[in-house]
Amino acid sequence: MSTLLLIRHGQASFGAGDYDKLSELGITQSFFLGEYWVERGMKLDAVFSGEQVRQKHTLEIVSDVYRAAGSDFPESGINGAFNEYDATGIMTHLLPKLLKENSELQEIVNKSSGIDTNSPEGRKIFQLAFEIVMDHWIAGKTEVEEVETWAHFKARVLDGIKKIVADFPSGKTVAVFTSGGAISATLQYAIQSPDKVALGLGWVVKNGSVTEFRYNADRFTLTGFNMTPHFYDDVLVTYR
């Protein structure tokens, strides 16, 4: 059997002008992953990332750690199948529509007025609103032309996963640097969970964590979820 490792990118820049950029902590998280793998002699046969900067940068940091240690690291491939869903687009296009009809969402948004998005309270309020909007998105209740549907997103991710399964069928270890949504879509494929459960699992995927699957032509099995043995201190654990 082969092994597939899905790595969530290091912490991005939530609340900043450009989210798609690793924070200083995200850079540190990525470095410790690379260091942990090098120390344990982790051999990778193939490495991929999505097209987003935070995904590619996480891969680059791990690659740099390997090369600085004189360890082999394969040339990476970029595959848009592993891009995250467009959370900004979903909120931009669906939130105004839902605010007209969802009183719970209206109340949450009203509470957010004047609160710093990066404060603990601001993050909590954002997450509550985000979950309501995302529930509508995955249910397909409110579709807009500008936003990729949940069904299309899942199909896109699984196309990428199935290509890896076909291209690296036996005795290989493949790493993919991606995001929480793509990891949750792959989890759903492995454990056959309902859509809402799959999306909920995405909320708890830690930055810089590793989720592991073992596969062959007949099986695709989850063998490790959200693993962060490379984080020596709780201060390194983030979810957004």
Q: What spans do the regions from the language model cover?
A:
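Extreme N-terminal starter segment of soluble prokaryotic enzymes
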Residues: 1-5
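Conserved beta-strand termini and adjacent loop/short-helix elements that scaffold enzyme active sites
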Residues: 7, 78-81, 225
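Active-site metal-binding loops of divalent metal-dependent hydrolases
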Residues: 10, 180-181, 226-229
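Loop-to-helix element that buttresses phosphate recognition and phosphoryl-transfer chemistry
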Residues: 10-64, 149-154
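Phosphate-coordination/substrate-recognition cap region in phosphate-metabolizing enzymes
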Residues: 38-127
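Acidic, low-complexity terminal tails and accessory targeting/binding regions
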Residues: 68, 85-107, 146-147, 151, ...
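Hydrophobic, aromatic-enriched interface-forming segments
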Residues: 115-167, 178
